[in-house]
Amino acid sequence: MSTETVAKLLSLQDIRYKAQKVLQKAESQSLKSFLYDPSKLPEVADFVVSVIQADFKGKYSTIPPHGRWQHFEVGNVPRLSQLVSKWEKEGVDSLEICKRVLDVTFVSVLLDAGAGDVWKYTDGKEAYGRSEGLAVASLRCFESGLFSSNPDFVYQVDGKALQALTSEKLGAGFQVTEQNPLAGVEGRATILRSLGKQLGSGRPSDFVGRIFPTGDFSKGLNVLELWSELQTLLIPIWPVRTSFEGQNLGDAWYLSTIDAIQPFHKLTQWLTYSLLIPFKSLLKVPVVNEELLTGLPEYRNGGLFVDLGVLTLRPEFSYATEYEPSSVTIVEWRAMTVVLLDKLLAFVNERLKPELSEPLSLAQMLEAGSWKSGRIIAKKLRPSTAGSPILIKSDGTLF
């Protein structure tokens, strides 16, 4: 591990680089927890293609990139779009509208760790669980001013309000009761309070002014610049799990399989994907280096490869065990998820080639294909919970 540096471990590029090393181990059946069967990948691709075709056949170019915006509008209710229209009618300028969307997206993604199998958020006549429920709940809390310290300016998130956010206030906003328990409420509130300390009196969206100090967006948004801003802001707020040379590394874990630290930075990547959408849709800012983002190593994408037999736990490991995020089992699974999503994208584009005007991006496949497919197969195999095939201990700050 002597060649490691903190900067490298916090970089986007190191995620794929290390995951490729894990794949090399898998190809010689040298993973410690899993057996790897690449012959099952075409079957996974067929399933994912069928899911994509069911929703988007003949209109593949309309597949949105993976991001939080779609979760806000679950049930075909244009909650965020209606807010944007309202602000436009009120004469709010496009930059401030974008900043408001960035603010709520920021908080919503940080709250988007696994909700558990029971919790639901009721919005109107509908109840939503899991990721979409968390999205709608966070949007409604944003609209109510929970994340703003200024009662005359509720449509913002600011550090002062976040520092004062208790788990009780957050739980109330998310309709948490004994009968409607949400996993990791205190962990979620702690993350937001930590973010508040980092922000001081500022807003999450203030990074826009640092990346574009003159307000000229014509140069485009470099994902690497955005990534640097986000890592600087967020690394100090994560619980210390793995550190290197005294520096917290966030979502990065030592993996004995490759005798190295395997970074993932999953929530920060999910945030990056999600923040790109308002830049593109509201400000029409071109984006470069987006391809450096990886597939997200979480249980929907990863579960797809377990449920369809690409990865199988070795006999000495049990599907009934709840594994720590730091365990070899979970870190191997997540690393393999990163590289298998890249492989899956190639298969999917090959199968859809006759129907596509241009190949699907990884972000589009994550949105319309792998994530949804993982959820569908989980519901089929585990109808009572639709949960993960491999159980992970969650504290509300990671998955």
Swiss-Prot record:
GO molecular function, one term: catalytic activity
InterPro entries in alphabetical order: DUF1688
GO cellular component, one term: cytosol
Family membership: Belongs to the URC4/urg3 family.
Protein name in UniProt: Protein urg3
Species, as recorded: Schizosaccharomyces pombe (strain 972 / ATCC 24843) (Fission yeast)
